Design a protein with these regions (language model features):
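Conserved helicase/translocase motor-coupling segment
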Residues: 17-84, 89-90
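Conserved nucleotide-binding/hydrolysis micro-motifs of P-loop NTPases
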Residues: 1-4, 75-78, 96-97, 110-113, ...
Length: 182
């Protein structure tokens, strides 16, 4: 069901190249939208929200939520997204287990703040292989990663692998959104 580049990422990192992929690759099927400027994450000690990444996603989808899922590991980010879009279109990774859509936007939320670093070092790190596999493989035609590239490149192997894969086989777009959090 997925574009070649999307399912090939999962095949390479999670299935030991045992999947047989029948779809052809499109260059724009995997996109990295990165911002390394704004260091804003709000936390209630249980979950996180990054309004800057929400604003970025708003600019990317232009209010057209049809055929799109917006996925995040964090409940607070999902709740904020659901206030803007329908609950059927936004949620945590677990929300979309077993579902698929043409486009998936994955907001990683964390950046180089003490809260972000603590989360990645803790026992409840939500960037496991299993969860990243679910997030990526929900996308049929396009997967868009909205993230702080440098932070994850330095602090999380699993997201770093995803970033490197997109940089090799997809498109890289610096986020040019003007935001009060920068």
């Amino acid at each position: 069901r997925c574009d070649y580049n999307i399912i090939n990422y999962c095949n390479k990192y999670f299935y030991d190249n045992k999947l047989i992929v029948y779809k052809e690759a499109k260059k724009d099927s995997m996109i990295l939208v990165y911002n390394d400027k704004g260091k804003y994450v709000d936390s209630d000690k249980v979950s996180f929200v990054n309004l800057r990444e929400i604003i970025t996603i708003e600019g990317l989808i232009n209010s057209d939520i049809a055929n799109k899922f917006i996925i995040t590991p964090f409940k607070n980010q999902a709740n904020n997204l659901c206030e803007k879009y329908s609950k059927e279109r936004c949620g945590t990774i677990h929300t979309f287990q077993g579902k698929g859509e043409k486009e998936v936007y994955f907001t990683t939320v964390l950046n180089n703040t003490s809260e972000g670093r603590k989360h990645l070092q803790g026992n409840h790190n939500l960037f496991t292989n299993e969860l990243i596999n679910v997030a990526v493989s929900r996308a049929k035609d396009k997967f868009v990663l909205v993230t702080d590239r440098n932070f994850f490149f330095e602090n999380d192997k699993n997201v770093k692998n995803l970033i490197e894969y997109i940089e090799a086989y997809g498109e890289i777009i610096p986020d040019k959104t003007v935001c009060i959090f920068d």
